[in-house]
Amino acid sequence: KKSKEPIKTFAIGMSEDAIDLKYAKQVAEYIGSEHKEVFMTPDEVLESLETVIQLLGTYDITTIRASMGMYLVCKAIHEQTDIRVLLTGEISDELFGYKYTDFAPDATAFQEESQKRIRELHMYDVLRADRCISVNSLEARVPFGDIDFVKYVMSIDSELKLNKYGKGKYLLRHAFEEGDYLPEEILWREKAAFSDAVGHSMVDYLKEYAEGTYSDEEFESLCMKYAY
């Protein structure tokens, strides 16, 4: 919103039940960006599944689910634009809290979980972003991953990060209150997982595909053969 020229923004969702697209459009209109919506179809999701698992090198369910949308939106950016460097919001959850850390019993537990998630960045969210972006010949810039910023946030008393305000990630939201960067309803909107926000039907199609590919007996047998 403060830049001399409008930035280009992108959002992705299922063609039938995308949740986040309308909110992304609202933000784009508010900040005056050149906005592009990318719709993914059930066929595109299923056709990309093997590629996504291969490029991730993991069978972690949550990472794969979240990577489907990121892979396809990066693919669209590469094929449809000349943009090669992206700004992305990774690491804010690790620093300021996930939805489940709203229920941390105390500040020590919150801090320990945050430290653990940062140590394991390369295994989950950053793995997803790194592979999905780079495989499409793009580069990422991660403002929340700035080392000085990470050290600063991790030095803040974890008591202040606990959800005592009725909203998760309160400190991050509060930091954006001044400056008129975001619409008020977006700033205080409930957090949603990326893999849900693209549309619940995506997971339904993946489940249907898996259940139609393997019987319960075959699955149990393969679990014994491939322990990891």
Which role does the model predict for each range below?
Residues 1-180, 196-209:
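ATP-dependent adenylate-handling active sites, centered on carboxylate activation for C-N bond formation
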Residues 183-190:
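A short alpha-helix-loop-beta-strand transition element characteristic
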Residues 192, 197-228:
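Peripheral terminal appendages
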